[in-house]
Swiss-Prot record:
EC supergroup of this enzyme: transferase
Catalysed conversion reaction: cytidine(1402) in 16S rRNA + S-adenosyl-L-methionine = N(4)-methylcytidine(1402) in 16S rRNA + S-adenosyl-L-homocysteine + H(+)
Protein name: Ribosomal RNA small subunit methyltransferase H
HAMAP family: 16SrRNA_methyltr_H
Cysteine pairs bridged by disulfides in the record: none
GO biological process: rRNA base methylation
Length: 331
């Protein structure tokens, strides 16, 4: 899907937008614009304004018709969603009333052979959500075997990561690995699967994609930025698609919705006021009809929270995840 499609209904879209509870005059951020599905649903509420963000220039260009239709109610920004606070500042917005995030790779990216995200098509081994920076082919060509194994294990949750890394290093000595089909075939030779299992290369592709786009760093930064710009009573709705993403969202909201433990020596100083109130303790998941219509919905989880009036907490000083630049320079 190359344009914002009026027929496109995002995974858990109605549930996520209902969680936002858009109101007339409110300003909302669709932090992962994609095909424009969440934005269209928000704009159905009269008098709402949407800021749509996407790092993919194809998504932004594809939203031109929706911008023409919505007029001043819709502004599209090509950027990473971790830059929410800076984007708001550049638009003169001190606060917004709601933020929706649909984390990870989009369907239109997965379905494009030229983008190199999927082993279902033979294409260049790219995997970048934007147009700049190293590709997955660069990682496969340059990363040390140990680093490849760590990436595939940590980000892909692949228990055969060391065997996969060895196979990649052996194969790249014979010829450059530049296509999705090449990589998928290499992985399939060392990761065995039974009928009904996921494709043997699924987890390896996930691990490389997450590293190339630094997706988990981005998510952590975006959640912290959302905390900074949401008005009291503003709502955050996040749809995630695998356990690493969901764990980050769940942990962030759990930490921000509880009172700090305090200290018997300095109880007043140590105590932190909750910055969010949970809207759901258990994640919302897709029903069977949605899963049948869109199999990708099977793993989707929706979590939400409402911003309190407490001051935002300081963002994390540094990331604990492997960094792309470090991997490419060998540590």
């Amino acid at each position: 899907m190359s344009t914002a499609d009026p027929r496109h209904v995002p995974v858990l879209g109605p549930e996520a937008v209902a969680m936002l509870a858009p109101r007339e005059g409110g300003t909302y951020i669709d932090a992962t614009f994609g095909a424009g599905g969440y934005t269209r649903l928000i704009l159905q509420s009269p008098g709402t304004r949407v800021i749509g963000i996407d790092r993919d220039s194809t998504a932004i260009a594809g939203g031109a018709a929706l911008v023409a239709e919505a007029g001043a109610r819709l502004t599209l920004v090509e950027n990473r969603f971790s830059a929410i606070a800076d984007i708001c500042a550049s638009l003169g917005l001190s606060q917004v009333d709601g933020i929706v995030m649909d984390v990870g790779v989009s369907s239109m990216q997965l379905d494009s052979a030229a983008r190199g995200f999927s082993f279902r098509f033979d294409g260049p081994l790219d995997m970048r959500m934007g147009e700049t920076g190293p590709t997955a082919a660069d990682v496969v060509a340059q990363a040390a075997e140990r680093d490849l194994a760590d990436i595939i294990y940590i980000f892909g949750e692949e228990r055969h990561s060391r065997a996969v890394a060895r196979a990649i290093v052996a194969a790249r000595k014979e010829q450059p690995i530049t296509t999705t089909r090449q990589l998928a075939d290499i992985v399939a030779r060392v990761v065995r699967s039974k009928p009904g299992d996921i494709h043997p290369a699924t987890r390896t592709f996930q691990g490389l994609r997450i590293l190339v786009n630094e997706e988990l760093d981005e998510l952590e930064q975006a959640l912290s930025a959302a905390e900074q710009v949401l008005a009291p009573g503003g709502r955050l709705a996040v749809v995630s698609f695998h356990s690493l993403e969901d764990r980050i969202v769940k942990t962030f909201l759990a930490e921000r919705s509880k009172t700090g433990g305090g200290s018997r020596h300095l109880p007043e100083i140590a105590q932190e006021t909750p910055t969010f109130q949970l809207l759901n303790r258990k994640p919302v998941v897709a029903d069977q009809s949605e899963i049948e219509a869109n199999p990708r919905a099977r793993s989707a989880k929706l979590r939400g929270a409402e911003r309190t009036a407490a001051p935002a907490r300081l963002p994390p000083a540094s990331s604990s995840w492997p960094r792309l630049a470090d991997v490419l320079r060998g540590g």
